[in-house]
Amino acid sequence: MSLPSLDSVPMLRRGFRFQFEPAQDCHVLLYPEGMVKLNDSAGEILKLVDGRRDVAAIVAALRERFPEVPGIDEDILAFLEVAHAQFWIELQ
């Protein structure tokens, strides 16, 4: 696996839907075969994955929103790498 580049534009793969699930009290990814429960960090990242923002814009927005989190850039890139490897997102 390799980290997504900062100019990549992530988007959810076809067939996946991101939403808050009250019954689970967390954000989830729904897809035809099931559901992925997401932790708070993953939910915050995927809120910004809209097929228009590049990775650099997502990182900048989250760094501004959570300035107290050390290493947030690397954490975001690592999550996007995993999400891509799991086929949750595509990178353009």
Curated annotation (Swiss-Prot):
- Which GO molecular-function terms appear in the entry? quinone binding
Q: List UniProt keywords, sorted A-Z.
A: PQQ biosynthesis
Against InterPro entries, the record matches this protein to: PQQD, PqqD_bac, PqqD_sf
Pathway assignment reads: Cofactor biosynthesis; pyrroloquinoline quinone biosynthesis
Its domain of life? Bacteria
Q: Which GO terms describe its biological process?
A: pyrroloquinoline quinone biosynthetic process
| NCBIfam families reported in the protein's UniProt record | PQQ_PqqD, PRK02079.1
HAMAP family assigned to the protein according to its UniProt record, in alphabetical order: PQQ_syn_PqqD
**Function of the protein:** Functions as a PqqA binding protein and presents PqqA to PqqE, in the pyrroloquinoline quinone (PQQ) biosynthetic pathway.
Subunit note: Monomer. Interacts with PqqE.
User: What's the protein called, per UniProt?
Assistant: PqqA binding protein
| Gene that specifies this protein | pqqD
